[in-house]
Amino acid sequence: TGTPISNSITEMYTMQRYLQYETLRKNGLQHFDCWASTFGETVTAIELAPEGTGYRAKTRFARFYNLPELMNMFKEIADIKTADMVNLPVPKANYHNVAVKPSKFQQDMVAELAKRAERVRARLVEPYEDNMLRITNDGRKLALDQRLMSPMLPDHDDSKVNACVENVFRLWQENSDKKLTQLVFCDLSIPKNDGNFNVYDDIRQKLIARGVPADEVAFIHDADTETKKKELFAKVRKGQVRILLGSTFKMGAGTNVQDRLIALHDLDCPWRPRDLEQRSGRIVRQGNQNDEVHIFRYVTENTFDAYLYQILENKQRFISQIMTSKSPVRSAEDIDETALSYAEVKALATGNPLIKEKMDLDIQVSKLKLLKAN
Protein backbone atom coordinates (compact mmCIF):
# COMPACT_ATOMS: atom_id res chain seq x y z
CA THR A 1 0.00 0.00 0.00
CA GLY A 2 1.15 3.54 -0.69
CA THR A 3 -0.90 4.91 2.19
CA PRO A 4 -0.94 2.60 5.25
CA ILE A 5 -2.04 5.59 7.34
CA SER A 6 -4.38 7.70 5.28
CA ASN A 7 -6.42 9.64 7.77
CA SER A 8 -5.85 8.96 11.44
CA ILE A 9 -3.23 7.78 13.92
CA THR A 10 -5.52 4.91 14.93
CA GLU A 11 -4.95 3.20 11.56
CA MET A 12 -1.46 2.28 12.76
CA TYR A 13 -2.99 0.43 15.71
CA THR A 14 -5.52 -1.33 13.45
CA MET A 15 -2.74 -2.41 11.10
CA GLN A 16 -0.80 -3.87 14.02
CA ARG A 17 -3.86 -5.60 15.44
CA TYR A 18 -4.42 -7.37 12.13
CA LEU A 19 -0.82 -8.36 11.55
CA GLN A 20 0.88 -8.69 14.94
CA TYR A 21 -1.78 -9.18 17.58
CA GLU A 22 0.41 -11.60 19.56
CA THR A 23 3.24 -9.07 19.78
CA LEU A 24 0.82 -6.42 21.03
CA ARG A 25 -0.58 -8.88 23.58
CA LYS A 26 2.89 -9.80 24.88
CA ASN A 27 3.61 -6.12 25.45
CA GLY A 28 0.21 -5.46 27.02
CA LEU A 29 -0.80 -3.18 24.15
CA GLN A 30 -3.75 -5.10 22.70
CA HIS A 31 -6.25 -2.49 23.95
CA PHE A 32 -6.27 0.84 22.19
CA ASP A 33 -6.10 2.90 25.40
CA CYS A 34 -2.85 1.18 26.44
CA TRP A 35 -1.42 1.56 22.95
CA ALA A 36 -2.41 5.21 22.75
CA SER A 37 -0.98 6.12 26.16
CA THR A 38 2.31 4.35 25.31
CA PHE A 39 2.89 5.78 21.86
CA GLY A 40 0.79 8.90 21.59
CA GLU A 41 0.33 12.20 23.34
CA THR A 42 -2.47 14.70 23.15
CA VAL A 43 -1.45 18.25 22.38
CA THR A 44 -3.60 21.35 22.85
CA ALA A 45 -3.12 24.06 20.24
CA ILE A 46 -4.91 27.12 18.94
CA GLU A 47 -6.66 26.22 15.70
CA LEU A 48 -8.99 27.86 13.26
CA ALA A 49 -12.64 27.18 13.92
CA PRO A 50 -14.36 25.13 11.17
CA GLU A 51 -16.64 27.95 10.02
CA GLY A 52 -13.59 30.00 8.99
CA THR A 53 -13.90 32.80 11.56
CA GLY A 54 -12.07 32.99 14.85
CA TYR A 55 -9.96 30.43 16.71
CA ARG A 56 -10.43 27.79 19.37
CA ALA A 57 -8.22 25.65 21.53
CA LYS A 58 -8.40 22.06 20.36
CA THR A 59 -6.88 18.99 21.99
CA ARG A 60 -5.87 16.25 19.60
CA PHE A 61 -3.51 13.35 19.09
CA ALA A 62 -0.61 15.15 17.50
CA ARG A 63 2.56 13.60 18.72
CA PHE A 64 4.08 10.14 18.72
CA TYR A 65 6.18 9.05 21.68
CA ASN A 66 8.59 6.11 21.96
CA LEU A 67 8.87 6.05 18.20
CA PRO A 68 11.98 3.80 18.02
CA GLU A 69 10.09 1.02 19.86
CA LEU A 70 6.94 1.56 17.82
CA MET A 71 8.87 1.49 14.55
CA ASN A 72 10.92 -1.57 15.53
CA MET A 73 7.69 -3.39 16.25
CA PHE A 74 6.03 -2.12 13.04
CA LYS A 75 9.05 -3.12 10.93
CA GLU A 76 8.57 -6.76 11.96
CA ILE A 77 5.56 -6.70 9.64
CA ALA A 78 6.33 -3.81 7.27
CA ASP A 79 9.03 -2.89 4.79
CA ILE A 80 9.02 0.86 4.27
CA LYS A 81 10.24 2.30 0.99
CA THR A 82 9.70 6.00 0.43
CA ALA A 83 10.04 7.98 -2.79
CA ASP A 84 13.42 9.42 -1.74
CA MET A 85 14.80 5.88 -1.23
CA VAL A 86 13.59 4.52 -4.57
CA ASN A 87 14.80 7.62 -6.41
CA LEU A 88 12.58 7.21 -9.48
CA PRO A 89 13.03 9.46 -12.52
CA VAL A 90 10.06 11.77 -11.91
CA PRO A 91 9.69 15.44 -12.89
CA LYS A 92 10.43 18.22 -10.39
CA ALA A 93 7.19 19.73 -9.07
CA ASN A 94 6.88 23.49 -8.65
CA TYR A 95 4.06 24.41 -6.25
CA HIS A 96 2.11 27.62 -6.72
CA ASN A 97 -0.32 28.74 -4.00
CA VAL A 98 -2.94 31.05 -5.50
CA ALA A 99 -4.85 33.04 -2.86
CA VAL A 100 -7.88 35.04 -4.02
CA LYS A 101 -9.86 37.67 -2.11
CA PRO A 102 -13.45 36.80 -1.13
CA SER A 103 -16.39 38.78 -2.50
CA LYS A 104 -18.59 40.87 -0.20
CA PHE A 105 -21.20 38.09 -0.28
CA GLN A 106 -18.63 35.44 0.66
CA GLN A 107 -17.49 37.55 3.63
CA ASP A 108 -21.08 38.06 4.82
CA MET A 109 -21.82 34.38 4.35
CA VAL A 110 -18.76 33.30 6.38
CA ALA A 111 -20.05 35.49 9.23
CA GLU A 112 -23.46 33.82 8.83
CA LEU A 113 -21.82 30.36 9.01
CA ALA A 114 -20.10 31.44 12.24
CA LYS A 115 -23.47 32.38 13.75
CA ARG A 116 -24.95 29.04 12.67
CA ALA A 117 -21.99 27.19 14.21
CA GLU A 118 -22.43 29.05 17.49
CA ARG A 119 -26.10 28.02 17.57
CA VAL A 120 -25.19 24.39 16.90
CA ARG A 121 -22.50 24.44 19.61
CA ALA A 122 -24.91 25.99 22.10
CA ARG A 123 -27.49 23.29 21.18
CA LEU A 124 -30.06 25.94 20.21
CA VAL A 125 -31.08 24.01 17.08
CA GLU A 126 -32.05 20.39 16.55
CA PRO A 127 -29.48 18.32 14.59
CA TYR A 128 -32.01 17.71 11.78
CA GLU A 129 -32.46 21.50 11.36
CA ASP A 130 -28.78 22.39 11.23
CA ASN A 131 -25.51 20.67 12.14
CA MET A 132 -21.74 21.08 11.73
CA LEU A 133 -21.67 18.72 8.75
CA ARG A 134 -24.14 20.89 6.87
CA ILE A 135 -22.28 24.08 7.84
CA THR A 136 -19.00 22.51 6.78
CA ASN A 137 -20.44 21.51 3.42
CA ASP A 138 -21.83 25.01 2.85
CA GLY A 139 -18.44 26.41 3.85
CA ARG A 140 -16.65 24.29 1.26
CA LYS A 141 -19.11 25.27 -1.47
CA LEU A 142 -18.89 28.94 -0.54
CA ALA A 143 -15.09 28.90 -0.73
CA LEU A 144 -15.23 27.35 -4.20
CA ASP A 145 -17.78 29.70 -5.83
CA GLN A 146 -20.53 31.90 -4.42
CA ARG A 147 -22.93 30.77 -7.17
CA LEU A 148 -23.06 27.35 -5.50
CA MET A 149 -24.94 29.03 -2.65
CA SER A 150 -27.33 30.72 -5.08
CA PRO A 151 -27.14 30.63 -8.90
CA MET A 152 -28.75 34.11 -8.90
CA LEU A 153 -25.51 35.64 -7.56
CA PRO A 154 -23.08 37.27 -10.01
CA ASP A 155 -19.87 35.60 -11.17
CA HIS A 156 -17.20 37.09 -8.88
CA ASP A 157 -14.29 38.26 -11.10
CA ASP A 158 -11.63 37.32 -8.56
CA SER A 159 -13.02 33.88 -7.74
CA LYS A 160 -10.92 30.71 -7.55
CA VAL A 161 -12.69 29.42 -10.66
CA ASN A 162 -11.70 32.49 -12.69
CA ALA A 163 -8.12 32.39 -11.39
CA CYS A 164 -7.94 28.75 -12.44
CA VAL A 165 -9.39 29.45 -15.92
CA GLU A 166 -6.77 32.20 -16.32
CA ASN A 167 -3.87 29.82 -15.52
CA VAL A 168 -5.26 26.90 -17.52
CA PHE A 169 -5.72 29.08 -20.60
CA ARG A 170 -2.25 30.67 -20.29
CA LEU A 171 -0.53 27.27 -20.05
CA TRP A 172 -2.71 25.88 -22.87
CA GLN A 173 -1.55 28.75 -25.08
CA GLU A 174 2.12 28.61 -24.09
CA ASN A 175 2.42 24.86 -24.74
CA SER A 176 0.31 24.51 -27.88
CA ASP A 177 3.29 23.56 -30.07
CA LYS A 178 4.12 20.55 -27.84
CA LYS A 179 0.44 19.71 -27.16
CA LEU A 180 1.10 19.55 -23.42
CA THR A 181 -1.86 18.65 -21.19
CA GLN A 182 -3.37 19.69 -17.84
CA LEU A 183 -5.58 18.18 -15.13
CA VAL A 184 -8.08 20.12 -13.03
CA PHE A 185 -9.24 18.44 -9.79
CA CYS A 186 -12.50 19.45 -8.16
CA ASP A 187 -14.52 17.20 -5.84
CA LEU A 188 -17.45 19.58 -5.44
CA SER A 189 -20.03 20.75 -7.97
CA ILE A 190 -19.59 17.94 -10.48
CA PRO A 191 -21.58 17.94 -13.75
CA LYS A 192 -25.00 16.29 -13.35
CA ASN A 193 -26.70 17.44 -16.58
CA ASP A 194 -29.73 18.63 -14.60
CA GLY A 195 -29.62 22.24 -15.79
CA ASN A 196 -28.25 23.53 -12.48
CA PHE A 197 -25.09 25.63 -12.24
CA ASN A 198 -21.88 23.64 -11.77
CA VAL A 199 -18.23 24.63 -11.79
CA TYR A 200 -17.20 22.09 -14.45
CA ASP A 201 -19.49 23.48 -17.17
CA ASP A 202 -18.56 27.01 -16.13
CA ILE A 203 -14.83 26.31 -16.65
CA ARG A 204 -15.41 24.55 -19.97
CA GLN A 205 -17.59 27.38 -21.33
CA LYS A 206 -15.06 30.03 -20.28
CA LEU A 207 -12.17 28.16 -21.92
CA ILE A 208 -14.13 27.65 -25.15
CA ALA A 209 -15.08 31.35 -25.15
CA ARG A 210 -11.36 32.19 -25.02
CA GLY A 211 -10.63 30.03 -28.03
CA VAL A 212 -9.87 26.54 -26.72
CA PRO A 213 -11.44 23.99 -29.14
CA ALA A 214 -14.39 22.22 -27.47
CA ASP A 215 -12.97 18.75 -28.20
CA GLU A 216 -9.77 19.58 -26.26
CA VAL A 217 -11.66 19.99 -22.94
CA ALA A 218 -13.15 16.85 -21.38
CA PHE A 219 -14.76 15.70 -18.12
CA ILE A 220 -13.80 12.35 -16.61
CA HIS A 221 -17.53 11.96 -15.78
CA ASP A 222 -18.35 11.62 -19.50
CA ALA A 223 -16.35 8.39 -19.67
CA ASP A 224 -18.80 6.22 -17.74
CA THR A 225 -17.50 2.82 -18.90
CA GLU A 226 -14.02 1.27 -18.76
CA THR A 227 -13.79 1.30 -22.57
CA LYS A 228 -14.68 5.00 -22.78
CA LYS A 229 -12.17 5.73 -20.01
CA LYS A 230 -9.39 3.96 -21.93
CA GLU A 231 -10.23 5.92 -25.07
CA LEU A 232 -10.25 9.21 -23.15
CA PHE A 233 -6.92 8.47 -21.45
CA ALA A 234 -5.35 7.58 -24.82
CA LYS A 235 -6.50 10.95 -26.20
CA VAL A 236 -4.94 12.78 -23.25
CA ARG A 237 -1.68 10.86 -23.68
CA LYS A 238 -1.56 11.85 -27.36
CA GLY A 239 -2.44 15.48 -26.61
CA GLN A 240 -5.79 15.38 -28.46
CA VAL A 241 -7.63 16.20 -25.22
CA ARG A 242 -5.46 18.81 -23.50
CA ILE A 243 -7.55 19.76 -20.46
CA LEU A 244 -9.19 17.06 -18.35
CA LEU A 245 -11.42 17.86 -15.36
CA GLY A 246 -12.34 15.33 -12.69
CA SER A 247 -12.74 14.43 -9.02
CA THR A 248 -10.18 12.64 -6.85
CA PHE A 249 -12.51 9.63 -6.72
CA LYS A 250 -12.79 9.26 -10.50
CA MET A 251 -9.44 10.66 -11.61
CA GLY A 252 -7.13 9.71 -8.73
CA ALA A 253 -5.58 6.24 -8.42
CA GLY A 254 -5.35 4.36 -11.72
CA THR A 255 -5.33 7.43 -13.96
CA ASN A 256 -2.16 7.08 -16.02
CA VAL A 257 -2.09 10.04 -18.40
CA GLN A 258 1.23 11.54 -17.28
CA ASP A 259 3.00 11.54 -20.69
CA ARG A 260 2.43 15.20 -21.61
CA LEU A 261 1.16 16.64 -18.32
CA ILE A 262 2.63 20.07 -17.59
CA ALA A 263 0.24 21.32 -14.88
CA LEU A 264 -2.25 20.15 -12.28
CA HIS A 265 -4.79 22.43 -10.59
CA ASP A 266 -6.29 21.70 -7.13
CA LEU A 267 -9.43 23.80 -7.19
CA ASP A 268 -10.69 22.51 -3.85
CA CYS A 269 -9.10 20.77 -0.90
CA PRO A 270 -9.96 17.14 -0.04
CA TRP A 271 -10.30 15.83 3.52
CA ARG A 272 -7.37 13.43 3.55
CA PRO A 273 -3.66 13.94 2.80
CA ARG A 274 -3.71 10.74 0.73
CA ASP A 275 -6.27 12.31 -1.64
CA LEU A 276 -3.99 15.26 -2.29
CA GLU A 277 -1.14 12.77 -2.70
CA GLN A 278 -3.19 10.73 -5.18
CA ARG A 279 -3.85 13.89 -7.16
CA SER A 280 -0.21 14.99 -7.39
CA GLY A 281 0.77 11.38 -8.11
CA ARG A 282 -0.92 11.75 -11.51
CA ILE A 283 1.67 14.28 -12.69
CA VAL A 284 4.78 13.62 -10.57
CA ARG A 285 5.16 10.23 -12.16
CA GLN A 286 7.57 8.14 -14.23
CA GLY A 287 6.90 8.45 -17.94
CA ASN A 288 6.23 12.19 -17.91
CA GLN A 289 8.24 13.74 -20.75
CA ASN A 290 8.57 17.08 -18.92
CA ASP A 291 11.48 17.69 -16.54
CA GLU A 292 9.51 20.25 -14.52
CA VAL A 293 5.78 20.43 -13.83
CA HIS A 294 3.50 22.87 -12.01
CA ILE A 295 0.94 22.20 -9.28
CA PHE A 296 -1.46 25.05 -8.50
CA ARG A 297 -3.46 25.15 -5.26
CA TYR A 298 -6.27 27.67 -5.07
CA VAL A 299 -7.61 29.12 -1.83
CA THR A 300 -10.16 31.81 -1.06
CA GLU A 301 -8.87 33.93 1.83
CA ASN A 302 -10.83 34.09 5.10
CA THR A 303 -12.98 31.10 4.21
CA PHE A 304 -13.29 27.43 4.99
CA ASP A 305 -10.23 26.65 2.83
CA ALA A 306 -7.98 27.64 5.75
CA TYR A 307 -9.64 25.10 8.04
CA LEU A 308 -9.33 22.32 5.45
CA TYR A 309 -5.62 22.85 4.90
CA GLN A 310 -5.18 22.92 8.68
CA ILE A 311 -6.82 19.48 8.91
CA LEU A 312 -4.49 18.17 6.20
CA GLU A 313 -1.48 19.65 7.97
CA ASN A 314 -2.40 17.93 11.26
CA LYS A 315 -2.95 14.57 9.58
CA GLN A 316 0.16 14.77 7.42
CA ARG A 317 2.25 15.55 10.48
CA PHE A 318 1.91 12.09 12.03
CA ILE A 319 1.78 10.18 8.73
CA SER A 320 5.22 11.59 7.91
CA GLN A 321 6.59 10.37 11.24
CA ILE A 322 5.85 6.78 10.22
CA MET A 323 6.38 6.88 6.46
CA THR A 324 9.99 7.98 6.54
CA SER A 325 13.38 6.59 5.59
CA LYS A 326 15.09 8.43 8.47
CA SER A 327 15.76 6.72 11.79
CA PRO A 328 13.06 7.66 14.29
CA VAL A 329 13.64 10.23 17.02
CA ARG A 330 12.41 9.58 20.57
CA SER A 331 9.38 11.85 20.24
CA ALA A 332 8.21 13.28 16.98
CA GLU A 333 6.34 16.44 16.41
CA ASP A 334 8.70 17.66 13.72
CA ILE A 335 6.70 18.60 10.67
CA ASP A 336 7.98 17.35 7.34
CA GLU A 337 8.06 19.28 4.07
CA THR A 338 4.56 18.16 3.00
CA ALA A 339 3.05 19.38 6.24
CA LEU A 340 4.94 22.65 5.84
CA SER A 341 3.45 23.28 2.42
CA TYR A 342 -0.06 22.76 3.83
CA ALA A 343 0.77 25.21 6.64
CA GLU A 344 1.74 27.84 4.08
CA VAL A 345 -1.50 27.39 2.16
CA LYS A 346 -3.44 27.64 5.42
CA ALA A 347 -1.63 30.85 6.37
CA LEU A 348 -2.54 32.33 2.99
CA ALA A 349 -6.16 31.40 3.38
CA THR A 350 -6.54 32.98 6.82
CA GLY A 351 -5.78 36.41 5.36
CA ASN A 352 -4.37 37.47 8.74
CA PRO A 353 -0.68 38.50 8.43
CA LEU A 354 -0.01 37.68 12.10
CA ILE A 355 -1.12 34.09 11.55
CA LYS A 356 1.27 33.93 8.59
CA GLU A 357 4.05 35.25 10.85
CA LYS A 358 3.23 32.67 13.52
CA MET A 359 3.31 29.90 10.88
CA ASP A 360 6.69 31.12 9.63
CA LEU A 361 8.10 31.11 13.15
CA ASP A 362 6.64 27.64 13.82
CA ILE A 363 8.28 26.43 10.62
CA GLN A 364 11.62 27.96 11.63
CA VAL A 365 11.42 26.33 15.06
CA SER A 366 10.58 22.98 13.40
CA LYS A 367 13.60 23.25 11.11
CA LEU A 368 15.90 24.19 13.99
CA LYS A 369 14.58 21.24 16.05
CA LEU A 370 15.31 18.99 13.09
CA LEU A 371 18.88 20.30 12.78
CA LYS A 372 19.37 19.85 16.52
CA ALA A 373 18.04 16.27 16.35
CA ASN A 374 20.50 15.48 13.54
Where in the sequence are the language-model features?
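Conserved helicase ATPase core of P-loop NTP-dependent helicases/translocases
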Residues: 213-248
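Residue-level preference for the first positions of well-ordered beta-strands
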Residues: 97, 181-183, 242-243
